[in-house]
Amino acid sequence: MDFSTNDTIAAIATAPGRGGVGIVRVSGIKAAEIAEHVLGKCPKPRYAHYGPFLGAEGQVLDQGIALFFPNPHSFTGENVLELQGHGGPVILQWLLERVVQLGARLAEPGEFSKQAFLNDKLDLAQAEAIADLIDASSQQAARSALRSLQGDFSNQVNELVEQLIQLRIYVEAAIDFPEEEIDFLSDGKVAGQLQHILEQLHRVLASAQQGVLLREGMSVVILGRPNAGKSSLLNALSGRESAIVTDIAGTTRDIVKEEIQIDGMPLHVLDTAGLREATDAVEQIGIQRAWAAIEEADRILVMVQANEAIHPEDQAILEKMPSHIPVTLIHNKIDLIEKSPELSENDGETEIWLSAKHHLGLDLLKQHLKTEMGYAQTEEGVFMARKRHLEALETALHFVETGQQQLEHFAAGELLAEDLRQAQQALSEITGQFTSDDLLGRIFTSFCIGK
């Protein structure tokens, strides 16, 4: 998608629908000229101006507050005009058409934020944090996104990049001046700096992993034979009657999905049709969808009945589970055998004894899910991150570890310098210092219009 930096762009910046206030945002070289036509004059910079918004014939379209921010002291780094009027869809569309008539064009999704990025008002991680802040599903997620927007994540990445640059300079100097009597590569300084960078990378990666969990959450699929209590567990976790619960086997015939939170971590829980040899066509489709959902899961909860031995059909379900997706075995209905809630681990396999109907042992399950996803209930130092950030950090970590091995085993300065360059490039992709146009297009077009 072509985002021109020479155009003047405009969009309705408030959410669709009716509201007390609606905002039309304008950014670009013609913003001041548009203000003169719509307001009769260009407002004093950064002062609220109250007055009528005028149409082409001088008629009043609306009245409200106008704000003008001259470049470069604006969100986009360009001249920015905001017209804050009444929040009716007809009025806002009327006002937007007037602005377009005066030379602006309709903004693409995320174009205001992209202009801010192109004009160095924020980096790519901060721009993404704007969308994450808007989409935050919990207070923890909002606070983490705000930290990223304020530059916490970017500052740590930039610090790592600077350390890599300084180390590259030192290593390449040692390569370029081999006649020096001192072997700079073996004097311990390079090894010490490499270790320091590795430790810092691990810390940033751990915080980023928490940020990804806050943003994207965990997908959990509940499986089992009919009447194992899958729907009861979904209802217990969600705190409401999301799924129909009866004693009739096969009540759930399609996937029921609930979005819940555990201490701020989003959890996408899917209740599936009971797995069995079904003859009903509708139930067969539900079972097929259940198997499809399994492949997309982060974790699978296989439910069996605590008041009976593992059924051959239960064993068959367990044996069919994909090896790359972790499974937790849930023994439900402990109230029928008067057993206390329990979590046990055997050879890396987790089993939880609970009663979904009576909400016994739910705390064990919730803590287990948080632990398995590596989620820590702390906000200190956690910033919002995306999977692409994790991939970049993991790539940088790989190259620094490889460079460390080149130094320790081969004293290969040239190979170390190249690994450091690759690590630097991977980190620079996070903030946009080294980023393809295709990536920029994908990121900014995912934003809402008006941002």
UniProtKB/Swiss-Prot annotation:
Domain TrmE-type G: 217-374
Coarse class of the protein's main subcellular location: cytoplasm
A single Gene Ontology CC term: cytosol
Annotated Mg(2+) binding sites: 231, 252
Keywords associated with the record: Cytoplasm, GTP-binding, Hydrolase, Magnesium, Metal-binding, Nucleotide-binding, Potassium, tRNA processing
GO MF assignments: GTP binding; GTPase activity; metal ion binding
CDD domains the UniProt entry points to: trmE (cd04164), TrmE_N (cd14858)
GO biological process, any: tRNA wobble uridine modification
UniProt xrefs under InterPro entries: G_TrmE (IPR031168), GTP-bd (IPR006073), GTP-bd_TrmE_N (IPR018948), GTPase_MnmE (IPR004520), MnmE_dom2 (IPR027368), MnmE_helical (IPR025867), P-loop_NTPase (IPR027417), Small_GTP-bd (IPR005225)
Enzyme class per UniProt: hydrolase
Entry note: cofactor: Binds 1 potassium ion per subunit.
Subcellular locations according to the entry: Cytoplasm
Entry EC number(s): 3.6.-.-
UniProt cross-references to PROSITE patterns, sorted A to Z: G_TRME
Residues involved in GTP binding: 227-232, 246-252, 271-274
Function statement: Exhibits a very high intrinsic GTPase hydrolysis rate. Involved in the addition of a carboxymethylaminomethyl (cmnm) group at the wobble position (U34) of certain tRNAs, forming tRNA-cmnm(5)s(2)U34.
Subunit structure, as described in the record: Homodimer. Heterotetramer of two MnmE and two MnmG subunits.
Protein name per Swiss-Prot or TrEMBL: tRNA modification GTPase MnmE
